[in-house]
């Protein structure tokens, strides 16, 4: 059994697909592709699928990843890409498939790029130059 890491972009309309819906998309696409994926051994078997560091709803990404276990000892990455990409919804593009070297929890860094209008530069500079920033936490009962 091999763990495969699928790298993909999630842009445009796909940025509004929630994590739970994204899991459903990948489950359906893996089933439709007939790739040799591993199913759990419980009463209701399902595909072993795990997403690493998912973004919030509405955020675009150029490098998301998920892991899926396969029944094979080795994989053909291009075969997987060719089988999955035509089934993906608009806005999700598979960029790379490779055997997972480390576990999802061992991923140490991520790079983020935030773009904002030029009119926000003054407010951003003021925030960055402030000695501290106060945040009011709101709970179900108020503040």
State what each model feature region is.
Residues 3-9, 112-116:
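Active-site-flanking beta-strand signature of metal-NTP-handling nucleotidyl enzymes
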Residues 37, 48-143:
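Structured-RNA-binding interfaces characteristic of tRNA pseudouridine synthases
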Residues 1, 29-32, 88, 116:
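Detector for methionine-enriched segments
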Residues 3, 12, 17-65, 70:
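Glycine/small-residue-rich interface belts in oligomeric ring/scaffold proteins
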